[in-house]
Curated annotation (Swiss-Prot):
It is found in: Cytoplasm. One of its GO terms (molecular function) is nucleic acid binding. Signal peptide: none annotated. It comes from Mannheimia succiniciproducens (strain KCTC 0769BP / MBEL55E). It catalyses: adenosine(37) in tRNA1(Val) + S-adenosyl-L-methionine = N(6)-methyladenosine(37) in tRNA1(Val) + S-adenosyl-L-homocysteine + H(+). GO terms for cellular component: cytoplasm. Specifically methylates the adenine in position 37 of tRNA(1)(Val) (anticodon cmo5UAC). GO terms for biological process: methylation; tRNA processing. It comes from the Bacteria. Coiled coil: none annotated. This is tRNA1(Val) (adenine(37)-N6)-methyltransferase. InterPro entries: DNA_methylase_N6_adenine_CS, Methyltranfer_dom, SAM-dependent_MTases_sf, tRNA_Adenine-N(6)_MTase, tRNA_adenine-N6_MeTrfase. Its EC number is 2.1.1.223.
Length: 242
């Protein structure tokens, strides 16, 4: 989903109510997917992990939403995105809450000795065979060596026994992941771009513990191409124009 809000822009980025995200050095720009995930994910515990942090958007959203004693770790493989995320964090009010690591997620999860209460990820979702002609963007978006199931299992390796994993995926990919994983789906939200359309994305929460799935639906635009009250309520704490 490539919908963008009309927030004030500076330094090729977006200014939110409490922080600014520059993204001109990042393959993946600030967009609705990441913002939805950062606003929708439930808060649990005080150790948070953002796998594939990119510009640092989700880590910064978590920092705004959580208490002062919480700690957020962001992992990013791309050197340019990592440097930009580091600068975005440094200029934010929460530099003391966020730690960034430049690693691929396989190495990070294999060497990480601590467990996290909450893991978030807006993972790659283009399958191989789609030529985007940009190596940096290729790294950020392709499912090349890791399937979504692999990605979820790596996230689970870092999770406490009672923790939660939150993802956003294309609708079909999300449905397939629900069938493939041994984890339990605690929440499933269908994201519809405009009223009357079919769902394009799934917001998903997974747990190691057995649970029933809380089903919901989120519509971004109504039939008059205006943001729905539901979407505004979810993102109100972040967008300048809400």
């Amino acid at each position: 989903m490539t919908t963008f809000m009309n927030n004030k822009t500076k330094s090729a980025g977006f200014t939110f109510k409490q922080f600014h995200v520059s993204h001109d050095k990042c393959a993946m720009k600030v967009g609705t997917d990441g913002i939805l995930l950062g606003a929708w994910a439930s808060l649990q515990g005080n150790r948070y992990l953002d796998l594939g942090t990119g510009s640092g958007l989700i880590a910064l959203m978590l920092a705004q939403r959580t208490q002062t004693d919480c700690h957020i770790t962001g992992v990013e493989i791309d050197p340019s995105a990592y440097r930009q995320a580091t600068e975005n964090v440094r200029q934010s009010p929460w530099a003391d809450k966020i730690q960034l690591e430049q690693q691929n997620i396989v190495d990070f999860t294999r060497t990480c000795t601590k467990k996290f209460d909450t893991v978030l990820s807006n993972p790659p979702y283009f399958e191989q065979g789609v030529d985007c002609r940009d190596k940096q963007r290729d790294t950020a978006r392709y499912t090349q060596t890791l399937s979504h199931s692999d990605w979820l299992n790596l996230a689970a390796d870092c999770l406490t026994n009672t923790g939660r994993i939150h993802l956003i995926l294309p609708y079909a990919a999300g449905k397939n992941l629900q069938k493939q994983t041994a984890l339990f789906c605690a929440r499933c939200c269908e994201v519809i771009t405009k009223s009357g359309k079919i769902p394009q994305r799934l917001l998903l929460t997974f747990s190691k513990q057995p649970c029933t799935t809380e089903q919901s639906r989120l519509v971004v635009y109504n039939e008059q191409n205006q943001y729905t009250e539901q979407f505004i309520a979810l993102t109100r704490d972040f967008y300048l124009n809400f």
